[in-house]
């Protein structure tokens, strides 16, 4: 940051609980309760860098009694770092981690909490788009949440293996039912 001032704006692409990716990394398995993660967020607060956190909102193939485990750990992390700007990539979803029945309610729990106004959600992935436009109800409810909190949702370029601009536009276009809602 001192060598190239103004060049870097954030820390992206770091994963904690991300489907089966986290288990493939050598060394200790990342965790939302690991003090090392606190040091990263302390640094982002101190330096003014934002962070894009890739972590699942729940476990793959989650059983109902465990659906809030990762979510509650994320809430605790967010509360410990109120001066860090945090973007939760893909609203915590993925190829295997699909929305549970109250997924949007969980997001709204964060959005409605004034102590968590530093947390944003990125929706730029074709897997997320599939869930959002899967049914008219899913699209309508997502649109209502975005309309209620329009400054907390981001559509960026965080798409897996993006090789050309047309791929980015294809993801954007998948959301057309949401844009029309």
Task: List where the protein language model places each region.
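Active-site gating/metal-coordination segments in enzymes
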Residues: 1-59, 120, 125
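Acidic (Asp/Glu)-rich catalytic clusters
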Residues: 1-9, 39-46, 76-82, 107-116, ...
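Extracytoplasmic/periplasmic, Sec-exported soluble proteins
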Residues: 3, 32, 62-69, 98-99, ...
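Conserved short-loop catalytic and cofactor-binding motifs
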Residues: 12, 28, 61-62, 95, ...
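Charged helix-capping and loop-helix junction motifs
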Residues: 26-37, 66-73, 101-106, 135-141
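Short, proline-centered helix/strand-breaking motifs
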Residues: 50, 82-85
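Single, functionally critical "micro-switch" positions that shape active/binding sites
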Residues: 53, 62, 66, 89, ...
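H/E-rich (His + Asp/Glu) clusters that bind or coordinate divalent metals
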Residues: 85-181
């Amino acid at each position: 940051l001192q060598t190239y001032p103004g060049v870097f704006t954030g820390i992206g692409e770091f994963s904690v609980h991300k489907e089966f990716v986290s288990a493939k990394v050598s060394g200790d398995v990342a965790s939302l309760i690991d003090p090392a993660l606190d040091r990263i967020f302390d640094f982002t607060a101190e330096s003014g860098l934002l962070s894009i956190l890739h972590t699942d909102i729940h476990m793959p193939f989650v059983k109902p009694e465990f659906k809030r485990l990762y979510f509650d750990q994320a809430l605790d992390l967010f509360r410990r770092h109120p001066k860090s700007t945090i973007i939760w990539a893909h609203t915590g979803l993925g190829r295997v981690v699909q929305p549970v029945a109250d997924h949007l309610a969980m997001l709204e729990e964060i959005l409605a909490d004034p102590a968590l106004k530093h947390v944003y959600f990125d929706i730029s992935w074709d897997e997320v788009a599939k869930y959002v436009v899967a049914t008219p109800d899913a699209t309508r409810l997502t649109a209502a949440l975005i309309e209620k909190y329009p400054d907390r949702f981001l559509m960026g370029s965080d798409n897996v293996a993006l090789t050309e601009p047309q791929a980015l536009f294809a993801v954007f276009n998948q959301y057309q039912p949401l844009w029309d809602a």
